[in-house]
């Protein structure tokens, strides 16, 4: 039977991608349905209890700048906040927070249940309704049919999921949840390329059985960082430390002696695992010269006794997991409350997607999250927001939108996936971006909030706050530009006390701030340049914009040159065999990838600059050279 009301957008799956997709579509005024197999696990942290990190924190800030949920949720649920790379330049500084799993899930569910235009329905989806290569709805396990103009698949590791512990395995979407086998079979019937990937999680430890007195503590930062541009530290719950232990030669011997019982090394697992979050058995074998690996003992919450030992993800048998855990300092009497495991699951080749995350072959069908070959909550959330907003735009008969690589880490993520694809779980790093200095955490709102407002994602409160910040930055920069001090002025002695070389000529506030030894806080503590801005975010922007002005201008020039290629469009139906002069390898790769632009084509492995030149000449001769606005 059909549900009585049609929807504009259906989201299938309530993880980090699904919740952001649902919120985005609903915020844009589209009637949205979120289908989940269990309402109680909306926003569930299936693996590590943390948000952010290098590259990942940048994505969270971008999701927040576009009105998303993740940053607000972690501000309400974070139990330890830190800035990573704090001593380095602003481009690579990244926020990370430990989370209370229960508080995080509660924050996500509360936001979803209070979002207008959004209905949540608990039922597993077993089928899609596809008519003439267009998705028009979904069918649940009890046969209930829902109609919609667009459908977003955010099903995580549930598609034909298989859990491995030692040489034993069973079907599962994650520990305690059933897999989605009928939907997996249905998707395999569609003209989509599908493969298998693998990820894993460590055993959870009972905190009451760990001797923390012999372990080093790791505390959060003070003052506490904040994730959301709309947040403040007063929202954070109680803060707690993490602890550090290490593996040792005994640990490594246990692992080496039991590799024949590892499903990965025994050849039972087909899927490729994450390169940057390897299992402990993988680390021991790949880094055989290392006699120890650092393990972070992370609390799972304020009201839980469970500890997440970050760094010992494993699929070895339970008895071996016990030996591994008890071989480490402080853990000699530790008890495991949940075994570690590996999970193998279907993913779909993201090269079959447009940059909007819509399928190239099934109109109105969008993919986001681990189904696209990524790993991590943050990567999933960013894709979910993009897929949700584009599903909403499609349902409203509007053109899709995707950020450029020069505009956002989200743009880098989507371009990497859709242009290059992935053979292993993809994780975001700052090193993946060519324009890191422009794509900082601190300026995510300056880069994206205006576009978010145009798209209908940003509410009035955020928009007002954003404009206040912009005005504060502009006013303060003008004030510093127009405030001068001379070597003979009474205030010169106070200024010189903060400088490595004293003033030799007249200098403005901005001139002084450009000096490496002068910070904004120091400058505005001087009588001549007081007072400082009360808005700490605006003050940070003033300092970064002034200090890095030359570098930023140079990178902006590079971006403008690159945009000429990015904006040169390639016809979606072009058969590259028509282009004389291209090698067979280049023809095969271009026909396989079907890049949307010259810029995308240039990033495909094996497509040479010479091939790009041939292609540009051919397009011009054919009168097909078009540039996007």
From Swiss-Prot:
Residue positions binding NAD(+): 273-287
Binding site for FAD: 13-18, 125, 180, 370
GO MF term set: flavin adenine dinucleotide binding
Cellular component terms per the entry's GO annotation: cytosol
Subcellular location: Cytoplasm
GO annotation, biological process: tRNA methylation; tRNA wobble uridine modification
Cofactor dependence: FAD
Keyword Ubl conjugation attributed: no
Family designation: Belongs to the MnmG family.
Subunit composition and interactions: Homodimer. Heterotetramer of two MnmE and two MnmG subunits.
Cited function: NAD-binding protein involved in the addition of a carboxymethylaminomethyl (cmnm) group at the wobble position (U34) of certain tRNAs, forming tRNA-cmnm(5)s(2)U34.
Protein name as catalogued: tRNA uridine 5-carboxymethylaminomethyl modification enzyme MnmG
UniProt source species: Salmonella dublin (strain CT_02021853)
Name of the gene this protein is made from: mnmG
